[in-house]
Amino acid sequence: MGLPWYRVHTVVLNDPGRLLSVHIMHTALVAGWAGSMALYELAVFDPSDPVLDPMWRQGMFVIPFMTRLGITNSWGGWNITGGTITNPGIWSYEGVAGAHIVFSGLCFLAAIWHWVYWDLEIFCDERTGKPSLDLPKIFGIHLFLAGVACFGFGAFHVTGLYGPGIWVSDPYGLTGRIQSVNPAWGVEGFDPFVPGGVASHHIAAGTLGILAGLFHLSVRPPQRLYKGLRMGNIETVLSSSIAAVFFAAFVVAGTMWYGSATTPIELFGPTRYQWDQGYFQQEIYRRVGAGLAENQSLSEAWSKIPEKLAFYDYIGNNPAKGGLFRAGSMDNGDGIAVGWLGHPVFRDKEGHELFVRRMPTFFETFPVVLVDGDGIVRADVPFRRAESKYSVEQVGVIVEFYGGELNGVSYSDPATVKKYARRAQLGEIFELDRATLKSDGVFRSSPRGWFTFGHASFALLFFFGHIWHGARTLFRDVFAGIDPDLDAQVEFGAFQKLGDPTTKKQVV
């Protein structure tokens, strides 16, 4: 046919059989990618330390999505929470991956069959004998089936009525596990961090989809609406489908980046706003304060802080710190976290407790400044030592660790104090293994960042695709040069205003 590469989809115009074939093949590719990617991730995933080396630190992309839907066991004998199991059952990570690959193969065969046997009777209009599709009826069928799937997911899978439930955790990502969820029918269901909203919204949306599908199956569109919205044109279907996809992509980009019940931090890592707002730091200080109120020592109070909570309060886990084009997992950046060194408390020779000012998200370097409880600068690591007034040496800063591996250890050597002050800029201090993966020390983003960037980018691209194909289908006759007033003869010079018959010139 000699079509240019950007017009090759023309071959499925007016060919319903092969239109179906290419869509089945597309499904085969999507399912095949998902299954293959899952097997690859399982081959490289290390489940041994779910606290300091969780899936999101290792750059896992599809494992978190399987996990949030109820898959936690592997045929390798491990559980995602760190335990060992003897009977993982068929729906393990490998089982789901295998099911996707088998499904992909069946779709591949079905696509070939429909490509070869494209001229089926079902696609022929009995009145004209030509291939045609009843698009409003097909819309009704798809809406009905999507509604059934949506309702079933919300009413059975999420609630645990017939299914595992979904991943549910506390606000600080410490106690996450798979559990059944009751639908939230009150106003709390609209809170994006309430898991019950997932069940209730799927039930409600599914019910609406079923009713709307039945409506479109039983009621024909009015002729003027059919013609006005070009319902007989397959490009209208393409345009509106792209609209649905880009809208969904924008929504999930938002829920992923800003966080929600569907994007738990245990599976996708913390959000950047949790670092910006000192979210975990405040909870840590609250717990320490509660411990001190119970007459615990500082050492005892800090020792009771979960290592998992301390690890969230580290800038290396902020998805906005990694550049978009720095390939690799977080572990390839700052290394594999081995252990929490403890919380450093700095004091000057006058006895003031000093706090290191933390690095904001979008800084690569930041001055080391230590302030007291009132925010007054008491010490720093100066750029020019000749002009310094607050250097660690001059102020006599010491550091003492509470909790973690260095619990009870103190340092007064200025070089060591400055080393830990620099590291305290980045949040809680962890020992990081850079040798194993040859990590380069440059921060990487988490799967939360990659997912957001990918979906926001494609949503923008698909938005333009929707506008493009929508305009093509609405103004198809204009673009083809078919003008409804084509029969009106316009003669240059016959009117004072070109084409305006009310300004016809008088013949002298």
Curated annotation (Swiss-Prot):
Chain's gene name: psbB
Membrane topology: Multi-pass membrane protein
Gene Ontology biological process: photosynthetic electron transport in photosystem II
Record keyword Cell cycle present: no
Family: Belongs to the PsbB/PsbC family. PsbB subfamily.
Membrane spanning stretches: 21-36, 101-115, 140-156, 203-218, 237-252, 457-472
Role description: One of the components of the core complex of photosystem II (PSII). It binds chlorophyll and helps catalyze the primary light-induced photochemical processes of PSII. PSII is a light-driven water:plastoquinone oxidoreductase, using light energy to abstract electrons from H(2)O, generating O(2) and a proton gradient subsequently used for ATP formation.
Name of the protein in question: Photosystem II CP47 reaction center protein
Cofactor info, note text: Binds multiple chlorophylls. PSII binds additional chlorophylls, carotenoids and specific lipids.
Organism field: Glycine max (Soybean)
